[in-house]
Amino acid sequence: TIMSHNVP
């Protein structure tokens, strides 16, 4: 995801 840099 864009909000969480950790996962897509």
From Swiss-Prot:
The N-terminus is blocked. Keywords: Allergen. The keyword Isomerase does not apply. It comes from the Eukaryota. The keyword Ubl conjugation does not apply. Disulfide bonds: none annotated. The MW of the complete protein is 65 kDa with a pI of 3.6. This is Allergen Fus s I3596*. It comes from Fusarium vanettenii.
